[in-house]
């Protein structure tokens, strides 16, 4: 029998959420490289932050500077990268935050594994469904060019598959419409499921 037990603190998630005036959730942005995940998540965070909500954005590149700096890009390492991010996100949600996470996360199994760690309604999958052709045209980091040349192996969308969500809570193609309207759609959804109070958004406008 393990000697490691969970210590229940006197302040819980509900207490922290009440203090912050919001219902904590994890918004998981998934899609191809260049789909616009980080841009969309960043714009949503800015809108929420400016309205006084407590947020944090976990970005695929940023976590590899510290939390996951010891990991490469093998299948095993990518799985471990997402496992760690999922655990950190869970702690942040427990702290009462609205957490935004922008990762390719190419397999349904990976995403479903993270979803399973959260109570019903706290994991919101946002499929950034921008087509491969558009992502490849954008290619902000030059990664698609390298992948086509064979310089990058197991590159999602080129030499490694991306499994689109079957039942994402939201689907947004960033090649259609403008960023402001896409953020508005996200905010409308969060308002509808009572994650945020719309009156605070009105007051900050």
From Swiss-Prot:
Gene3D superfamilies membership: P-loop containing nucleotide triphosphate hydrolases (3.40.50.300)
Database matches in Pfam families: APS_kinase
PANTHER family: ADENYLYL-SULFATE KINASE 1, CHLOROPLASTIC (PTHR11055:SF63), BIFUNCTIONAL 3'-PHOSPHOADENOSINE 5'-PHOSPHOSULFATE SYNTHASE (PTHR11055)
NCBIfam families with a match to the protein in the record: apsK, PRK03846.1
Pathway in which the depicted protein is active: Sulfur metabolism; hydrogen sulfide biosynthesis; sulfite from sulfate: step 2/3
Keyword annotations from UniProtKB, A to Z: ATP-binding, Kinase, Nucleotide-binding, Phosphoprotein, Transferase
Name recorded for this polypeptide: Adenylyl-sulfate kinase
Domain of life, per lineage: Bacteria
E.C. code: 2.7.1.25
SUPFAM superfamilies the UniProt entry points to: P-loop containing nucleoside triphosphate hydrolases
Keyword Lipid metabolism included in the entry's annotation: no
HAMAP family: Adenylyl_sulf_kinase
Catalysis: reaction(s): adenosine 5'-phosphosulfate + ATP = 3'-phosphoadenylyl sulfate + ADP + H(+)
Chain's gene name: cysC
Any one GO biological process: hydrogen sulfide biosynthetic process
First-level EC class: transferase
Positions with a binding annotation for ATP: 31-38
InterPro entries per record: APS_kinase, P-loop_NTPase
One Gene Ontology MF term: ATP binding
Catalytic machinery residues: 105
Species the sequence originates in: Shewanella sp. (strain MR-7)
Function field: Catalyzes the synthesis of activated sulfate.
Family (UniProt): Belongs to the APS kinase family.
């Amino acid at each position: 029998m393990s000697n490691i037990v969970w210590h229940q603190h006197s302040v819980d998630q509900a207490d922290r959420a009440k203090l912050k005036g919001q219902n904590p959730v994890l918004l998981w942005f998934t899609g191809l490289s260049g789909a616009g995940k980080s841009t969309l998540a960043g714009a949503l965070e800015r809108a929420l932050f400016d309205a006084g909500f407590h947020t944090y954005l976990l970005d695929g590149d940023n976590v590899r500077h510290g939390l996951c700096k010891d990991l490469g890009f093998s299948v095993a390492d990518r799985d471990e990268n997402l496992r760690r991010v999922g655990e950190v996100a869970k702690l942040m949600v427990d702290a009462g935050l609205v957490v935004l996470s922008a990762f390719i996360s190419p397999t349904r199994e990976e995403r479903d594994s993270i979803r399973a760690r959260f109570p019903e309604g706290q994991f919101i999958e946002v499929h950034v469904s921008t087509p491969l052709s558009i992502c490849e045209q954008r290619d902000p980091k030059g990664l698609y060019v390298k992948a086509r040349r064979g310089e990058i192996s197991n590159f999602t969308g080129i030499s490694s598959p991306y499994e689109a969500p079957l039942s994402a809570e939201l689907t947004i193609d960033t090649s259609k419409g403008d960023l402001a309207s896409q953020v508005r759609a996200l905010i409308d959804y969060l308002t509808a499921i009572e994650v945020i109070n719309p009156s605070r958004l009105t007051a900050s406008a």
